[in-house]
Amino acid sequence: MPVFHDQQRDALRRMYLEAWQRHQEGMPLTPLQAQVADVVALHPEYHALLTPDALDRDWKPEQGQTNPFLHMGMHLALREQVSTDRPKGIRDVHVVLTRRHDSAHEAEHRMMEPLGAALWDAQRQGVAPDEQRYLAALRSL
């Protein structure tokens, strides 16, 4: 794996650790740190993993492991998409799913599989994600 990728991954993971630590210590947070801390707070199963040792750890989906940083990052990505309503209509889908599941957090969990599939397809094909196909998958939930 390229060194640049490892440095980016470590910096991103360090941001989660720092935001959570600042939140726990009651220190002021930037808006991004507050968003990160909010997502971390919703995932107590990951709290013990937010240590410097996690910076280098790999989670292997083929072994049934969930990468907590990827999972929480998808929450942040979905929240950004909903806040900007991009793709157009995703906010409405989120509202419907939130009502159906009585939880915005659960709605985001339902939306993760279509998001992951859209990103995977785009990466595999070397193109931008197909927003309309992604939105159609979300609407079918």
Predicted segments, located by residue:
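N-terminal leader/targeting peptides and immediately adjacent processing regions
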Residues: M1-E45
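Aromatic-anchored, charged helix-turn/loop surface patch used as a conserved interaction hotspot
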Residues: L32-T98
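Non-catalytic terminal/accessory segments
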Residues: P68, L78, V82, G116-L119, ...
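Well-ordered alpha/beta subsegment
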Residues: H109-E113
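Glycine-rich, aromatic-bearing surface loops/beta-hairpins
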Residues: V127-L141
